[in-house]
Amino acid sequence: MMRNNPNDDRVVFFDVDDTLLDTSTFAETARKAAIELMVDNGLPLDKDEAYGVLKTIIRQKGSNYGKHFNILTEVVLGHEDPMLVALGMITYHNVKIALLRPFAETIDTLIYLKSQGYRLGVISNGITIKQWEKLVRLNVYSFFDEVITSEEVGAK
């Protein structure tokens, strides 16, 4: 089949994490801030020890697991402490939101590709709502014609 325009099929796909934005740095900073507040409010470990336990939990459960701080208090205290869990979760999310920024060249690159007639998409490993949250918070969601996550296709 002949194509009318060879440019009709020009597509560029991006990942979200560590491609459009630096998730590794903001996640580490947010986790350390959460641990600091949890320790300051009664988690009986020093900050480095507590962060080490949290990193072990994240390695075991995966970064998309939603109850890292619950498990942390269970491991350290022998039971879940809702106040400490809430402090950890709220601090993590507040710091994450404050630091969530696209890489410096992201917006210019997306604008350029769109201006050149490229269709843009996202293929990303993660929970669909979390990936969309990042795209919306970064205000880049409107650049993308398609967003596909591992959760949607049943992959891990």
Q: What do the PLM-derived regions correspond to, one by one?
A:
Residues 39, 74-75, 114, 136:
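Short polybasic/polar patches that bind polyanions
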Residues 99-101, 127-156:
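Substrate-recognition "cap/lid" segment bordering the active-site pocket of phosphatases
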Residues 45, 56-91:
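A metal-dependent, Asp-based hydrolase signature
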Residues 124:
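Conserved phosphate-coupling serine/threonine residues in phosphotransfer and NTP-handling enzymes
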Residues 17-20, 117, 139:
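Conserved functional loop/turn residues at catalytic and ligand-binding sites
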Residues 8, 66-67, 75, 81, ...:
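Short, acidic loop-to-helix structural element flanking the phosphoryl-transfer center
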Residues 30-38, 54, 69, 73, ...:
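Hydrophobic alpha-helical core bundles mediating ligand binding, dimerization, or RNAP-core interactions
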Residues 2-49:
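Active-site neighborhood of HAD-like aspartate-dependent phosphohydrolases
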